[in-house]
Regions:
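Sec-dependent bacterial lipoprotein signal peptides
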Residues: 1-20
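Hydrophobic alpha-helical segments and their boundary regions
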Residues: 5-6, 113, 203
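A generic structural signal for short, solvent-exposed coil/turn residues
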Residues: 7-10, 32, 92, 173
Length: 232
């Protein structure tokens, strides 16, 4: 258990800032100060901004699932959401505020670490656990609209299930990040789930870059979704 715990802790540190072990400096966002005027009403459960390893037991359904802390990136997810919304919606100049009901990120390394433990291939925690290992095929970010009630139903003891994925979404069972965004912008509330596998063309992907991809998709959903036909 001590070895597994050490593996997860080092992995957690590695994943806190990046998804695929970049060697380059993290990206910057020129002009982000222009959106400082956008007030962020943070209505998230306090726990969503905190780091957590859900289980160290290999037999647990929550094994190797990790919640990423807000301070893992600069800017934070909600701050980057406000900036991209400011760029996307000129109307925010007249209504300079957004409500963030959920913005939370999970790392799911369950299949990867179970395989490693079972086969006894613990050849170094960072090498074995980083998302984006060369042994996994690259894919694309997958974003879908969800009913925000899904997040309420999975709070508490079921929170780890938010990091699950289907075989169709991730047939190779690669380590992934799963990012949930639930925000009200210009009076319209939209919730989304974004699955980030090792990304094609991005061998060195920072977590904040994954945020940016998911936010772009979320804002596209915001434009296209009619509240009357939103997911139930």
């Amino acid at each position: 258990v001590h070895l597994i715990k050490s593996l997860l802790v080092v992995t957690a540190v590695a994943l806190s800032g990046c998804t695929t072990a970049p060697t380059l400096p993290p990206p910057t966002f020129p002009g982000i100060e222009q959106s400082n005027k956008i007030a962020i009403e943070d209505l998230r459960p306090a726990s969503e901004s905190e780091k957590k390893i859900f289980s160290l037991m290999v037999s647990s359904d929550a094994y190797a699932i990790y919640r990423v802390a807000d301070n893992a990136t600069d800017p934070t997810g909600p701050r980057l959401l406000a900036h991209r919304a400011y760029e996307a919606f000129p109307q925010l100049a007249e209504q300079p505020s957004i409500k963030v009901l959920h913005f939370v990120t999970y790392a799911n390394m369950q299949s990867h670490l179970r395989r490693s433990v079972t086969q006894g291939l613990l050849i170094g925690p960072v090498g074995m656990a980083l998302v984006g290992s060369p042994s996994y095929p690259s894919s694309e970010v997958l974003t879908s609209a969800i009913n925000s009630e899904q997040l309420e139903r999975t709070a508490g003891d079921q929170e780890h299930t938010r990091a699950y994925f289907t075989e169709q979404e991730n047939p190779s069972k690669s380590p992934v990040n799963v990012i949930y965004i639930d925000a009200e912008i210009l009076g319209k509330r939209v919730a989304s789930r974004c699955l980030v596998p090792p990304v094609t063309g991005k061998p060195n992907l920072f977590l904040v870059e994954a945020f940016d991809m998911c936010i772009a998709n979320h804002l596209a959903l915001h434009r296209s979704i009619n509240p009357a036909t939103a997911p139930q």
